[in-house]
């Protein structure tokens, strides 16, 4: 048998000689440590991603509309019970909690369902994909938004039991409830409350305390819970007791929509390795990765009042050429513009911006400052786009 050789001087050529195997295997195999490409600069990454054209928009829209009754579906003679939105609403009324899975962002899907179907009570929406959302924040929003109770309770479980006791006292006189629980109770106690949790499997809610608390919250008869999941194996978060309390009925409803909002905070998708993402600051005190597109994406999910408050803040900072403003000054401006009537109301409106680290709240002495960690030029771009979207 002929031995294979080439014109080069490669010493690791294999032949029929048995000893050649051991000769070759003793050579050191070194692998370069520079196998990974360097992450893109966040600004460059945003520019490149903006060039990606959406695909299959007609098919996505048709899929989205297949979940609920549209004029086209009605003309085709489809019955209401054929649509998942109708089934979900029925399940909620039969004391099930609803868990929605499927590839693609489901924010618009769930928001549409709540807007069209859940009209017999208030709805509270929570963004489980926020890295710093805590179950305490969620419970506080429930007690403050529904009952006007502004107080902190020792533990999440105790807070949830406190909420449960409020709902159980529905037959109590309003004045007595105010004395007992300390809230305003301007609208009494609603018969139906819809609690929406986008990404209940989000990083900040994956701990046992959070899931135990949410499961306990789901046992309140007046509370109808709607949640979405995206992580593979998310249901491993719950033991048998939690599953019994949640009482899930599950729906697969893929949308194939991009996860723009969910990933707007994610450091792993912003480039820059460690320290990248929304919360990364430069030595000048500005957040080098907080881009206008990121802020505008967040603003799309907020109310008109929240957007107007943010515009007032931007206008003041641009005029003063600063990146911080006293909370008291912003409150006076917003009160005069009839955007808020109390400081607690302003704090509630600012919560979303603080959660996304678009606004940083800092105490200096006895004064509370609100800081937007971006350059004035970036503020001007954002304000200009906000005003153009209105005009």
From Swiss-Prot:
A Pfam family annotated for this chain is RecA-like_ORC2
Q: Does the keyword Acetylation apply?
A: no
InterPro entries xrefs: ORC2, RecA-like_ORC2, WHD_ORC2
Question: Biased-composition ranges for Polar residues?
Answer: 22-38
Please give one Gene Ontology molecular function term for this protein: DNA replication origin binding
Q: Where is this region: Disordered?
A: 1-43
Alphabetized UniProt keyword annotations: DNA replication, DNA-binding, Nucleus
Is Thylakoid among the key words of this record? no
Q: Which GO terms describe its biological process?
A: DNA replication
Its main localization is: nucleus
Q: Where in the cell is it found?
A: Nucleus
* Gene Ontology cellular component terms for the protein in this record: cytoplasm; nuclear origin of replication recognition complex; nucleus
Give the UniProt family note: Belongs to the ORC2 family.
Which PANTHER family does this entry report, sorted A to Z?
Answer: ORIGIN RECOGNITION COMPLEX SUBUNIT 2
Subunit notes for this chain?
ORC is composed of six subunits.
What's this protein's function? Component of the origin recognition complex (ORC) that binds origins of replication. DNA-binding is ATP-dependent, however specific DNA sequences that define origins of replication have not been identified so far. ORC is required to assemble the pre-replication complex necessary to initiate DNA replication.
Q: What is this protein called?
A: Origin recognition complex subunit 2
Q: Which organism is it from?
A: Dictyostelium discoideum
Question: Where is the organism placed in the taxonomic lineage, from the top?
Answer: Eukaryota, Amoebozoa, Evosea, Eumycetozoa, Dictyostelia
């Amino acid at each position: 048998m002929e031995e294979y050789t080439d014109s080069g001087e490669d010493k690791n050529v294999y032949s029929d000689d048995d000893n050649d195997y051991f000769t070759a295997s003793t050579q050191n195999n070194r692998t370069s440590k520079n196998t990974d490409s360097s992450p893109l600069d966040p600004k460059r990454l945003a520019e490149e991603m903006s060039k990606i054209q959406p695909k299959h928009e007609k098919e996505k829209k048709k899929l989205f509309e297949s979940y609920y009754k549209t004029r086209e579906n009605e003309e085709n003679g489809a019955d209401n019970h054929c649509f998942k939105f109708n089934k979900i609403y029925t399940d909620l009324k039969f004391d099930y909690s609803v868990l929605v899975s499927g590839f693609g962002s489901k924010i618009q899907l769930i928001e549409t369902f709540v807007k069209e179907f859940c009209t017999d009570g208030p709805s509270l929406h929570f963004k489980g994909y926020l890295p710093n959302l805590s179950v305490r924040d969620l419970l506080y929003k429930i007690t403050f938004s529904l009952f006007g109770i502004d107080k902190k309770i020792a533990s999440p479980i105790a807070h949830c039991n406190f909420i449960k006791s409020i709902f159980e006292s529905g037959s109590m006189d309003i004045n007595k409830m105010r004395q007992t629980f300390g809230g305003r109770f301007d609208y009494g106690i609603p018969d139906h409350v819809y609690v929406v949790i986008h990404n209940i499997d989000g990083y900040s809610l994956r701990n046992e305390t959070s899931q135990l608390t949410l499961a306990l919250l789901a046992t309140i008869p007046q509370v109808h819970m709607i949640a979405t999941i995206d992580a593979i194996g998310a249901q491993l978060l719950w033991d048998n007791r939690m599953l019994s309390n949640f009482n899930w009925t599950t729906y697969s409803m893929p949308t194939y929509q991009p996860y723009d909002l969910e990933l707007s905070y994610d450091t792993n998708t912003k480039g820059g390795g460690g320290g990248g993402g929304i919360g990364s600051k430069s030595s000048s005190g500005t957040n080098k990765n907080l881009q206008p597109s990121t802020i505008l994406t967040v603003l799309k999910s907020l109310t008109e009042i929240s957007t107007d408050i943010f515009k007032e803040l931007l206008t003041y900072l641009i005029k003063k050429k600063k990146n911080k403003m006293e909370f008291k000054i912003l409150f006076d401006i917003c009160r005069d513009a009839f955007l808020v009537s109390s400081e607690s109301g302003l704090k509630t409106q600012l919560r979303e911006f603080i959660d996304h680290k678009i606004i940083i709240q800092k105490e200096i002495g006895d004064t509370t400052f609100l800081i937007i960690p971006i350059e004035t030029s970036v503020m001007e771009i954002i304000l200009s786009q906000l005003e153009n979207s209105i005009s």
